[in-house]
């Protein structure tokens, strides 16, 4: 069994450790007509800088950031802080658009050091960023709720809070906050993107489609609206339509990496490995920096895994490791080593898997990240090696590591990590043939991980819950299409679904 690992680019993920989209402050460029521009500006979080040049660069960068053009936006935010070295929100946006962990943590520190000279609203944005960097979700939520209360007419504050809820898998909360943002400013396109994803994860695909179509209508000359719509089409199994919509995004912006990724996955889901590889190669050719090259090579890896070619997947992973080593990027090396461990674990080589998991932890402990993230890396290591021990039939080690993980996650873990406690407990129950307990625990684990869904389907089948097993197997095989775990068990999930449909 394998669980989450190297995260793929997502249409709601900004960069690095930030699990939710952090929305820049200031008056919206897409404001409606009422009330007056002066009244609306007074209702927004201000942008504090002594430099008109820095402000102009910031606003240009924010417009690009809104449309997920992170590389281009980062260049402008970097210029903004050159124009005003005390520009706290400029550093905030450098952090949210940076491509490496070292740059992210450095810019976060710079923003925090300059926060005292910023407005109270900007300070709350920065407090939320710092809390996110330290995995302190309680403090992050507190800052965001105070931000919304202080600026109840700023649509961006609602999207900020809504995206936090999205990251917590509170999709109803995300729908509520994005809808409030739209009430304030019906022309704020980013709110429709969040609304569409939240509806999708609530299985309200019709409402998701309406939101994404409105998103396209508002900014038809940007790539991301088409990318979001294409992802929904892929989730709905409309693979050919999805590919065409992704191509529309690439016609607008040939460097929009997310869309190459989507085309690659579509072809893999259609059982077209050569076309999947071709799209991944195109993604690699379009890469403009180290992070984009790594993301592209990762999709080469997953296309090989979808095709059942473990050897080729490991070979490309070694190339990723070599390039990351040249860059001295221990975060990237840690992520790749972890995924290589996942590959080996699914292949049944638990000794090799643990070697890679150990290497992943070593790299992360050497990385330019804070102590909270290093502690989280140690928890990830416990989680992974617990599962490896189960597969190796080392019940004592599995139970000991799982107990240690649970104790650490319950005190220091994020909401995601706490769901993983239930996942580990479900695996332990399943290996002990306590299927009723396993089924209940799987229900409390992440419902967006194909691995959890697959094993939950297996357990429910064994319990005779055929309708639920079919539903779970279908979701395991056909949903969460960007999830890095999907290649590992999709073929098994498809086979299980076929068996269940025949009964």
Residue ranges and their predicted role:
Residues 50-79, 83, 123-138, 142, ...:
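Alpha-helical segment of the N-proximal tetratricopeptide repeat
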Residues 51, 85, 116-119, 152, ...:
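Short coil turns that delineate tetratricopeptide repeat
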Residues 79-80, 110-114, 146-147, 180-181, ...:
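Canonical positions in the second alpha-helix
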Residues 22-24:
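C-terminal motif of bacterial Sec signal peptides marking the signal peptidase cleavage site
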Residues 54, 88-89, 121, 155-156, ...:
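Helix-start (N-cap) detector for alpha-helical repeat units in TPR-like alpha-solenoids
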């Amino acid at each position: 069994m394998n669980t989450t690992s190297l995260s793929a680019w997502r249409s709601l993920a900004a960069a690095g450790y930030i699990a939710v989209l952090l929305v820049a402050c200031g008056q919206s460029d897409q404001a409606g007509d009422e009330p007056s521009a002066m009244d609306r500006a007074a209702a927004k979080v201000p942008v504090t800088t002594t430099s008109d040049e820095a402000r102009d660069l910031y606003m240009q960068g924010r417009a690009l950031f809104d449309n997920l053009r992170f590389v281009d936006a980062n260049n402008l935010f970097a210029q903004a802080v050159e124009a005003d070295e005390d520009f706290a929100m400029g550093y905030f946006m450098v952090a949210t658009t940076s491509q490496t962990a070292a740059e992210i943590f450095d810019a976060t520190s710079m923003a925090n050091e300059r926060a005292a000279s910023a407005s109270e609203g900007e300070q709350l944005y920065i407090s939320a960023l710092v809390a996110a960097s330290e995995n302190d979700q309680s403090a992050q939520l507190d800052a965001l709720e105070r931000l919304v209360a202080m600026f109840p007419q700023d649509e961006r504050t609602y999207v900020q809070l809504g995206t936090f809820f999205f990251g917590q898998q509170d999709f109803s909360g995300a729908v509520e906050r994005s809808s409030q943002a739209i009430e304030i400013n019906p022309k704020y396109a980013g709110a429709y993107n969040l609304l569409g994803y939240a509806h999708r994860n609530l299985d309200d695909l019709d409402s998701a489609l309406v939101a994404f179509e409105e998103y396209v209508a508002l900014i038809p000359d940007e790539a991301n609206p088409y990318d979001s719509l294409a992802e929904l089409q892929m989730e709905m199994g409309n693979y050919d339509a999805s590919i065409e919509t992704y191509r529309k995004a690439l016609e607008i912006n040939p460097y929009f990496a997310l869309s190459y990724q989507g085309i690659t996955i579509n072809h893999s889901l259609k059982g077209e490995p050569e076309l999947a590889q071709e799209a991944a190669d195109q993604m690699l050719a379009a890469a403009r920096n180290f992070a984009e090259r790594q993301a592209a090579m990762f999709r080469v890896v997953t296309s090989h895994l979808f095709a059942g070619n473990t050897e080729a997947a490991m070979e490309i992973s070694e190339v990723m490791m070599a390039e990351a080593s040249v860059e001295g990027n221990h975060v990237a090396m840690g992520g790749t080593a972890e995924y290589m461990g996942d590959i080996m674990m699914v292949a049944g080589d638990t000794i090799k898997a643990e070697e890679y998991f150990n290497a992943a932890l070593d790299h992360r402990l050497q990385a330019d990240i804070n102590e909270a993230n290093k502690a989280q890396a140690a928890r990830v290591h416990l989680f992974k090696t617990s599962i490896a021990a189960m597969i190796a039939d080392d019940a004592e080690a599995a139970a000991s590591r799982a107990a240690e993980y649970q104790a650490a996650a319950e005190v220091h873990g994020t909401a995601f990590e706490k769901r993983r406690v239930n996942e580990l407990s479900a695996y332990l129950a399943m290996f002990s043939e306590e299927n009723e307990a396993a089924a209940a625990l799987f229900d409390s684990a992440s419902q967006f991980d194909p691995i959890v869904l697959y094993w939950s389907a297996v357990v429910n089948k064994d319990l005779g819950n055929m309708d639920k097993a079919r539903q779970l197997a279908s979701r395991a095989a056909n949903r969460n299409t960007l999830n890095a775990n999907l290649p590992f068990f999709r073929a098994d999930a498809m086979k299980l679904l076929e068996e269940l449909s025949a009964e």
